[in-house]
């Protein structure tokens, strides 16, 4: 197997493209929200056929949902009236949390003959206390290998004196 990782800027987004060159599988991840915006296979005619809603389209739609496979958190729906209290700390935010609106750091890319991965990271330095008041980091890894595509979420508690934050 042969894998490649390339980067591109498109419509104001920084994208990472991870491709299985031999089996014709490709994922594209936007660093904005660490969002998977394309998962596609190449067909016999040499065209990429996507599996996601609005696959590989980063333009704003005329109406409707603008995302593809959103990473949501640390809360998943809405905060009533845009705010809530968590452990005595106020949280303010919109729908589906703040993670999808943040630019994540590419913490590493890895390719070899058996697979390839992209690891993204967001830390407490990347968000405001009003967005989430506790110190938690998230690593998100997308991987392609012989078994397919996988996604791994890893949470790191930077306040070990406190019990679970999520």
Where do the language-model regions lie?
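Surface-exposed acidic/polar loop and edge beta-strand patches at domain peripheries
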Residues: 1-154, 158-166
């Amino acid at each position: 197997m042969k894998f490649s990782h390339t980067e591109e800027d498109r419509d104001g987004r920084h994208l990472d493209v991870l491709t299985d060159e031999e089996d014709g599988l490709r994922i594209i991840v936007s660093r904005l929200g660490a969002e998977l915006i394309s998962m596609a296979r190449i067909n016999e005619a040499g065209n990429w056929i996507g599996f996601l809603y609005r696959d590989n389209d980063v333009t704003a739609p005329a109406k409707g949902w603008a995302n593809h496979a959103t990473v949501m958190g640390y809360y998943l729906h809405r905060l009533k009236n845009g705010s809530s209290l968590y452990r005595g700390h106020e949280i303010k935010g919109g729908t589906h949390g703040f993670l999808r609106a943040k630019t994540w750091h590419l913490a590493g890319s890895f390719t070899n003959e058996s697979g390839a991965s992209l690891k993204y990271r967001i830390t407490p330095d990347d968000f405001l206390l009003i967005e989430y008041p506790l110190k938690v980091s998230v690593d998100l890894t997308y991987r392609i290998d012989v078994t397919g595509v996988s996604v791994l979420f890893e949470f790191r508690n930077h306040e070990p004196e406190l019990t679970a934050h999520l």
